[in-house]
């Protein structure tokens, strides 16, 4: 097993010669998330940290790896963390760029901002990573004991000064010394194996641990695998497989443990090393299958092709590494006709799929050879002796041939006793009810049942699909399986790909287990294999195995499956070895539902679409492509091929025979000259060995590209639609002859001749739908259709890969039936699409148009290959198609652009640049697609094409409803859309002067969901946003089928979003701004982002819409109703509150039980009324935000924003976009929130110009971006720069905004005003009051420029004039309940009384907090337990009676404090603190390090030192920005209060008075933190912890109960330091006012500011700025709910006077002057007198 036999070597050596034409380059060092397992994964999977020996090994290997990457690009961008330190399958250390998230501050060296990445910086990060890995323990008592050497090394590596850190050489030397007896490589290999071994589902590559993990307990069936040892390949097909011994689990548990302890047994090493690797074949599910495949040549060829296809993309588009690898793993194909023959003779990829390929997809001799090979060469393997193969035909080699001889759709009935297909008609009616077990086998044995009438098993579905399930498909499958599982009374013990059945409507149900009782141990839970009771969680385990197999389908086994973390975590949890650790079905359903709900997806629709895409084709008459991306593009009318022009081929007759002609085909003039000629691509020498794609009708393509999986079309309805389409065949035929001479190189809607009649070559060879991607070295095909005069036509339409039938085919590339296709053999592997132009489409979301169902060329339904769209709608855009042709002719090489999506998107983008100057045109293209070389001649040709004679007529803006249903549409607009209502308003690209090539909404869907799902995307790319046009186009329904994405979750958000966008655009001077004068989204927008407004708000607004009788959905129409209801609720609240106050006074006098009962009821009513008022205020805020969202642009239109100032008066300018205007996005799985749809990608980074332009993006207000920007923009631009940017946009669009209210100019103008108003409202005190020049400039601009043309801007000018007063008023209003005066009058007693008379203590319940482990804090009174507020804090009491009655203090000195109650002092101190806090702004807490604020109380800057900062202090703001230093005033005040507290105590002349004051301050502090005044509480704690106070003898006589408060204060301080958002958790911060500690909040923000703000390309990390904005937004959150205590001016004056008196005093000197601060030494009775005399004598001598 260790070495490959000579025959095998010879086979691979010979096979390798066929691959020599490839230019091999070294693979990327770090294919991120592909083969690597990170240290974080290892730690979390095995649930313990590294041992000391492992730490030495990892340190050594990392140091060596670090030295090897010193000159690599990753060295400058790497930050070593547990997530970026990874191990590949060989155990080698790898570094991965974790671009999707900022590293934690603990791993970033302190000097990083100044020095960047250096060896010293990486050593610091490595030390921090190792420290974290060593301390990763689930329980405190398991903390490791480290040796002195290791502890010292880690400490040195994490030294603050880089010069004190050891160098690499010394680290390596020390590690090698410590690793003398062991091999560090072996230990790291063991760690790598652990990361893969812990999860049995994921441990495909670790064969030695085959049965020692989760799957342990059931031996593999003896006859599952071949019985012979590897031998001569020419005589023994089993030589392709490992021996049977590998399949057997260890004989005993001891053997299992021994195998588990070995790092990795040597025997499977050859399986993991090239060229013999674990290539997994389609349809294989079991671990045994995976071992059988270990020496499969097909797997190796696929993997080599895979790596070649991944190579170019990984290097050219590093931002899409993750997508590239994931996509390319789905692109398995064969190379070369010779190789294909050899492969087919040695090992079938999948018998079921192979039969289809042999019959319909590949040549006939393949089927014959494979059918003949296995039964003859392996007679010993009988069907009745292969129980393990009952569901996996490929498991037994002998079975494959017999399977091919049986029913083509089902395989052998004997071989598969209980197949999966079920009658689809019944399943439609049954819904989610599982079919009875008796009926399934009976129906499935009907050989005549077709795919359209049966359900499919997952194995059939995957085989026909030819690729693994994508992420959202896995979520849908998981939800459907679990939902079906809940309906079962008896939980199935065994689920696999064969008995998980998918009905036509997407319903999943479970078939019976194998009739012979054979189970694959992969799909058995450990407890089931041990013959324990089958529980629900055992079935959950089976579902996880099924999902993992579906996700791993056709992925090479030595590649780590790249799944998103959220999905992977769920699968791992579901596959836990112990049932108790697995989630229940309900819990897993909740996770799946939240994911799908966020994206507006429906699981049944997704699965129904998948099933429809594979089941509508009759296998006998329709061909299925090889695998994944080379799927079928349905044969549209006059479909043309997309071949190379190697030897030229011309069709000489109307059949499919092709005749070669010597040399290139003579070319005719270009198609744009309206002549019938052959495109130059077929005749150009430059296109030899290049796939040529003729662009299809973009009007149809656009709809299908954006086809949503969750479309509301039912499959059966779609079938009816197909039939209706089929009836138009004759009309299409007539249209062909009428249009073919007029439309050159564009689509002629008519049936395809080859598709109209079945032809024998198409059945035995490769028919039209077999594969579209031409082989790089294969012959070119040119098909001429009868009656078209040689005009080649591209496919009429095509679908995104996952939406196309039988796989994913590239756009516009269809190889017509003919023997040549079969002789081509292999196809070039699919390359991942370009990062900027396109990515593998995988979105289930759709465009605004009608979503067409995928329709293969099903000759039974539609003998003419189903014309996809009606004949009158087939007008194409010649300019766009010619542009695509030029692009492909230039760049389609080595498989690039094989699938046509790249060319389509690039062509549409370029087409959008029409009407620009040539220089601007060239600059925009070069910047957008900067990774390609654009020849000047090519740019000239493209410029000529897009600005050709046909352009002006197409560039005119279409008015709503101007386009008839059957009139020819522009190339970019869906021809399926019968109406274009609202097009100009909601699709800004259509008003780009050029008319825009596409619907921006659809383009947005494509860009975000289907074309750029890579990890990173640079440039202005579209994101998924609420598509408001979907429900505005009910006439887009065809046959009663509604438009896409109207499920329960998306419906609410779409409805609400629709309110914000008028149907007719509204007048230019829309009065909405005057009705909704508050444009600021508020702190909640920055903090909660998309979750700011919950589903209740959406539903309420939707109800408002339904109540409108006049049909208006304008915001202005909603406002009066809402305002009226809000006013009524406020009035009721005030009346009830006044009645409550009267009853309260009566209760005080009478103390009657009846009054008390009524008071209790009234309290509940008041709470309910207050909640209602707050809710209505939130709805009002939402409508205000949606007014701003009304003017949002799709991100694809954002380049207009960047250089709009230079645009001519009638067009929008696409000036060259350089690095200064880029944005970077990344994919995330956002956590479930309010149910609102969220974006698939969020902004990761951007340059200042790009970030400012992104303010104009749709949903920028709703998603919180605007508010976060307003908090943080000073890090990258000054207020003057920002104002200049806004005013430029306003001035550039002002004159044009009033010409067309629906234009993009209007949207830019209105959004600019909204952003400007939000800025003024939110940051007036920060940016405008202190900067008179900025304020004057804005006022002058509004007065002189805006007001003469737009009177609605008057409110903005008024806002500037009363800015200060308005800001102060809004801050003092509690929850916006009423007018300020009424609020002060009414809410104050309500809040106070509710707090005082709350018997259940709701308002006094303390926040949840804890002491973090290992913080070193020792609590003397509560060592044995962890602090909680409930346990640490007794019931609140103010001790009013304990300290005597209230007395007016007139004398000075500490005695006056004892004359006031604790509550009086607490309330007045709170009001004093609140007065200061209300004046601060979140921006004041930013960049505090530059102000000298340090993480020590002693370092709080004094008044004298605050102005002179250290030279080392470097500001994070721009140098010319003058920062407001109000934070220093807050901190100085806090320091003064602490000093006052300490001074009052140490200046008390008696111990008794000191005890009284200590008690007083402790009880005040206790009241403070109970009432959430953490600022004063921490200030008092600071005073009490002063050294002079702590040394006071009064502590010794302080009552124990009072002394405990000190420990509680310390615990609260620890809690406040633990989490930057701890005060925002729970309901208390909403119900009660809060005053945070300014110093601690500044420290939290400082911690977030640690690390680099900019990336290597100069872009600012928006993810970091977003987190800072969230923390800073707490300031405004707490200011919204102020305390309503009654002020006591006299007491406040006394407190201010005492605090000012001790401000800046030295407490130690004050303490030294007071003898009460010294401990009395016991002695003789005269000792005190002697001491007094000595003191007096000393005074006389001085």
UniProtKB/Swiss-Prot annotation:
Biased segments, Polar residues type: 403-412, 782-791, 1043-1053
Tissue: Highly expressed in the brain and at low levels in the ovary. In the brain it is most prominently expressed in the cerebellum where it is restricted to the granular Purkinje cell layer.
Ranges of compositional bias, category Basic and acidic residues: 426-445, 711-727, 847-861
Any single GO BP term: cerebellar granule cell differentiation
Compartment(s): Cell projection, Dendrite; Perikaryon
Record's keyword annotation contains Phosphoprotein: yes
Modified residues (Phosphoserine): 267, 951
SMART domains in UniProt: KIND, RasGEF
Annotated ranges, domain N-terminal Ras-GEF: 1239-1367
Coiled coil spans: 1112-1177
Keywords recorded for this protein, A-Z: Cell projection, Coiled coil, Guanine-nucleotide releasing factor, Phosphoprotein, Repeat
Protein's recorded name: Kinase non-catalytic C-lobe domain-containing protein 1
Species of the source: Mus musculus
């Amino acid at each position: 097993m260790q070495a490959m036999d000579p025959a095998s070597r010879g086979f691979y050596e010979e096979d390798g010669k066929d691959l020599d034409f490839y230019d091999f380059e070294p693979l990327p060092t770090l294919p991120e998330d592909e083969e690597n397992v990170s240290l974080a994964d290892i730690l979390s999977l095995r649930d313990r940290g590294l041992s000391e020996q492992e730490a030495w090994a990892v340190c050594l290997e990392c140091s060596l790896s670090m030295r090897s990457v010193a000159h690599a690009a990753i060295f400058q961008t790497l930050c070593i963390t547990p997530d970026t330190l990874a191990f590949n399958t060989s155990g080698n250390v790898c570094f991965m760029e974790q671009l999707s998230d900022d590293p934690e501050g603990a791993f970033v060296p302190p000097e990083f901002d100044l020095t960047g990445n250096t060896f010293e910086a990486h050593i610091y990060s490595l030390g921090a990573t190792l420290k974290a890995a060593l301390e990763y323990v689930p329980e405190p008592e398991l903390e490791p004991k480290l040796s002195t050497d290791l502890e010292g090394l880690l400490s040195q590596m994490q030294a603050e000064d880089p010069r004190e850190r050891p160098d690499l050489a010394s680290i390596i030397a020390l590690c090698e010394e410590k690793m003398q007896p062991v091999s560090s490589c072996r230990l790291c290999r063991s760690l790598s194996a652990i990361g893969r071994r812990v999860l049995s589902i994921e441990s495909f590559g670790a064969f030695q641990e085959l049965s020692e993990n989760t799957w342990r307990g059931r031996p593999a069936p003896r006859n599952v695998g071949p019985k012979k040892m590897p031998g001569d390949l020419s005589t023994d097909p089993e030589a392709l497989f490992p021996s049977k011994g590998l399949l057997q689990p260890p004989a005993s548990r001891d053997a299992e443990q021994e195998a588990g302890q070995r790092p990795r047994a040597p025997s499977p090493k050859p399986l993991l090393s090239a060229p013999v690797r674990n290539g997994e074949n389609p349809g294989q599910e079991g671990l045994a299958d995976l071992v059988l495949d270990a020496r499969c040549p097909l797997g190796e060829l696929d993997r080599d092709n895979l790596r070649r296809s991944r190579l170019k993309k990984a290097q050219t588009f590093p931002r899409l590494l993750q997508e590239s690898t994931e996509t390319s793993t789905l692109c398995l194909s064969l190379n070369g006709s010779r190789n294909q023959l050899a492969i087919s003779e040695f090992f079938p990829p999948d018998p079921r799929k192979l039969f289809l390929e042999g019959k319909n997809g590949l040549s006939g001799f393949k089927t014959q050879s494979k059918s003949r090979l296995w039964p003859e060469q392996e007679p010993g393997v009988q069907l009745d002796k292969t129980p393990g193969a009952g569901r996996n035909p490929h498991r037994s080699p002998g079975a494959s041939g017999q399977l091919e001889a049986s029913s083509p759709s089902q395989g052998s009935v004997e071989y598969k006793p209980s197949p999966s297909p079920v009658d689809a008609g019944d399943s439609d009616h049954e819904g989610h009810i599982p079919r009875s077990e008796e009926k399934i086998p009976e129906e499935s044995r009907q050989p005549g049942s077709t795919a359209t009438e049966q359900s499919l098993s997952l194995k059939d579905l995957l085989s026909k699909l030819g690729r693994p399930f994508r992420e959202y498909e896995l979520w849908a499958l998981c939800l459907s399986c679990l939902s079906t599982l809940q309906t079962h009374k008896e939980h199935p013990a065994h689920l696999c790909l064969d008995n998980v059945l998918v009905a036509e409507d997407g319903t999943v149900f479970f078939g019976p287990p194998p009739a012979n009782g054979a189970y694959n141990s992969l799909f058995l839970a450990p407890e089931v294999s041990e013959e324990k009771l089958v529980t629900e969680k055992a079935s959950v385990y089976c579902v996880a195995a099924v999902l993992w197999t579906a996700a791993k389908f056709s992925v090479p086994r030595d590649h780590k499956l790249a799944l998103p973390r959220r999905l992977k975590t769920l699968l791992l949890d579901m596959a836990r070895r112990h049932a108790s650790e697995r989630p229940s079905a309900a819990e897993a359903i909740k996770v799946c539902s939240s994911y799908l709900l966020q994206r507006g997806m429906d699981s049944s629709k997704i699965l129904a679409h998948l099933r429809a895409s594979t089941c509508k084709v009759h296998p006998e008459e329709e061909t299925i492509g090889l695998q994944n991306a080379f799927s079928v593009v349905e044969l549209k009318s006059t479909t043309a091929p997309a071949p190379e022009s190697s030897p030229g081929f011309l069709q000489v007759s109307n059949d499919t025979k092709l005749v070669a002609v010597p040399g290139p085909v003579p070319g005719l003039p270009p198609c744009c000259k309206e002549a019938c000629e052959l495109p130059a691509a077929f005749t150009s020498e430059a296109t030899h060995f290049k796939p040529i794609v003729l662009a299809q009708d973009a009007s149809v393509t656009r709809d299908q590209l954006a086809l949503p999986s969750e479309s509301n079309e039912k499959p059966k309805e779609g079938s009816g639609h197909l039939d209706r389409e089929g009836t138009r065949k004759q009309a299409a035929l007539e249209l062909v002859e009428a249009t073919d001479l007029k439309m050159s190189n564009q689509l002629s809607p008519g049936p395809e001749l080859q598709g109209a009649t079945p032809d024998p070559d198409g059945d035995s060879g490769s028919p039209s739908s077999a594969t579209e991607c031409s082989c790089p070295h294969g012959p070119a095909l040119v098909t001429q259709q009868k009656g078209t005069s040689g005009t080649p036509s591209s496919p009429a339409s095509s679908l995104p890969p996952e939406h196309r039938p039988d796989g994913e085919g590239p756009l516009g590339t269809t190889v017509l039936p003919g023997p040549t296709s079969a002789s081509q053999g292999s196809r070039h592997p699919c390359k991942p699409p370009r990062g900027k132009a396109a990515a593998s489409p995988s979105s289930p979301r759709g465009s605004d148009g009608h979503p067409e169902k995928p329709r293969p060329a099903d000759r039974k339904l539609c003998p003419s290959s189903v014309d996809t769209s009606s004949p009158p709608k087939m007008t194409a855009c010649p300019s766009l198609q010619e542009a695509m042709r030029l692009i492909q002719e230039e760049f389609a090489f080595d498989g690039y652009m094989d699938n046509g999506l790249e060319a389509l998107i690039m062509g549409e983008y370029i087409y959008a640049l029409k009407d620009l100057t040539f220089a601007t045109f060239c600059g925009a293209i070069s910047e957008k697609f900067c990774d390609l070389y654009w020849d000047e001649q090519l740019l000239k040709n493209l410029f000529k094409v897009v600005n050709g004679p046909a352009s002006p007529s197409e560039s005119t803006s279409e008015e709503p409803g101007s386009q008839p249903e059957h009139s020819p549409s522009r190339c970019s607009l869906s021809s399926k859309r019968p109406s274009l209502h609202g097009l100009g308003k909601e699709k800004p690209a259509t008003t780009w002067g050029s008319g825009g090539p596409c619907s921006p909404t659809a383009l947005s869907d494509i860009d975000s969901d289907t074309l750029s799902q890579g990890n990173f995307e640079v440039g202005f790319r579209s994101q998924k946003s609420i598509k408001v046009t979907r429900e505005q186009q009910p006439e887009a329904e065809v046959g009663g089928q509604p438009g896409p994405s109207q499920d329960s979750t998306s419906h609410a958000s779409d409805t609400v979003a629709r309110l914000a966008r008028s149907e007719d655009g509204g007048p230019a001077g829309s009065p909405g701004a005057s009705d909704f004068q508050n444009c600021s989204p508020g702190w909640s927008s920055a903090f909660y982002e998309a979750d700011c407004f919950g589903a209740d708000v959406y539903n309420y607004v939707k109800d408002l819409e339904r109540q409108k009788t006049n049909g208006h959905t304008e915001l202005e129409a909603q406002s009066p109703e809402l305002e009226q209801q809000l006013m009524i609720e406020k009035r009721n609240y005030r009346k009830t509150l006044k009645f409550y106050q009267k009853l309260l006074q009566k209760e005080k006098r009478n103390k009657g039980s009846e009054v008390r009962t009524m008071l209790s009821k009234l309290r509940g009513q008041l709470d309910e009324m207050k909640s209602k008022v707050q809710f209505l205020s939130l709805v009002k805020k939402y409508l205000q935000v949606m007014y701003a969202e009304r003017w949002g642009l799709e991100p694809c239109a954002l380049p207009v924003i960047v250089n709009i100032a230079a645009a001519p008066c009638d067009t929008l300018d696409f000036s060259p976009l350089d690095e200064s205007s880029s944005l970077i996005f990344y994919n995330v799985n956002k956590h479930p929130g309010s149910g609102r749809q969220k974006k698939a990608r969020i902004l990761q980074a951007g340059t200042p110009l790009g970030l400012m332009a992104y303010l104009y993006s749709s949903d920028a207000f709703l998603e919180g971006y605007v508010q976060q920007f307003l908090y943080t923009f000073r890090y990258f631009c000054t207020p003057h720069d920002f104002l200049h940017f806004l005013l430029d946009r306003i001035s550039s669009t002002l004159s044009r905004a009033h010409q067309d209210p629906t234009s993009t100019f209007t949207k830019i103008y209105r959004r600019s005003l909204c952003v400007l108003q939000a800025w003024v409202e939110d940051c007036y005190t920060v940016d405008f009051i202190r900067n008179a020049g900025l304020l004057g400039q804005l006022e002058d601009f509004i007065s002189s420029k805006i007001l003469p043309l737009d009177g609605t801007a008057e409110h903005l000018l008024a806002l500037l004039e009363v800015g200060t007063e308005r800001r102060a008023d809004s801050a003092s209003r509690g929850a916006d309940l009423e007018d300020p005066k009424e609020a002060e009058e009414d809410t104050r007693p309500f809040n106070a009384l509710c707090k005082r008379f709350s018997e259940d203590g709701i308002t006094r319940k303390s926040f949840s907090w804890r002491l973090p482990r290992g913080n070193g804090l020792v609590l003397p009174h509560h060592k044995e337990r962890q602090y909680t507020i409930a346990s640490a804090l007794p019931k609140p009491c103010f001790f009013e009676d304990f300290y005597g009655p209230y007395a007016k203090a007139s004398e000075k000195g500490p005695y006056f404090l004892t004359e006031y109650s604790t509550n009086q002092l607490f309330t007045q101190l709170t009001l004093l603190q609140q007065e200061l806090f209300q004046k601060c702004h979140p921006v004041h807490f930013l960049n505090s390090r530059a102000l000298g604020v340090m993480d020590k109380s002693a370092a709080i800057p004094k008044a004298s030192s605050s102005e002179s900062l250290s030279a080392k202090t470097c500001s994070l703001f721009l140098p010319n920005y003058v920062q407001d230093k109000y934070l220093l005033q807050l901190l100085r005040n806090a320091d003064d209060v602490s000093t006052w507290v300490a001074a009052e105590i140490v200046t008390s002349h008696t111990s008794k008075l000191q005890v009284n004051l200590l008690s007083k301050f402790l009880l005040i502090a206790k009241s403070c933190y109970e009432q959430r005044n953490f600022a004063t509480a921490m200030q008092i704690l600071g005073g009490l912890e002063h050294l002079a106070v702590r040394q006071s003898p009064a502590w010794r006589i302080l009552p124990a109960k009072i002394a405990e408060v000190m420990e509680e204060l310390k615990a609260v301080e620890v809690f406040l330091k633990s989490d930057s958002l701890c005060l925002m958790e729970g309901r208390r911060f909403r119900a009660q006012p809060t005053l945070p500690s300014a110093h601690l909040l500044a420290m939290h923000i400082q911690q977030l500011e640690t690390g680099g703000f900019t990336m290597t390309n100069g872009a600012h990390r928006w993810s970091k700025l977003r987190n800072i904005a969230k923390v800073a937004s707490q300031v405004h959150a707490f200011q919204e709910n102020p305390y309503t205590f009654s002020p006591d001016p006299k007491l406040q004056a006394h407190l201010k006077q005492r605090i000012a008196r001790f401000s800046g005093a030295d407490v130690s000197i004050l303490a030294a002057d007071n003898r009460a601060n010294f401990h009395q030494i016991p002695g003789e009775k005269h000792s005190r007198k002697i001491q007094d005399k000595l003191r007096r004598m000393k005074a006389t001598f001085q």
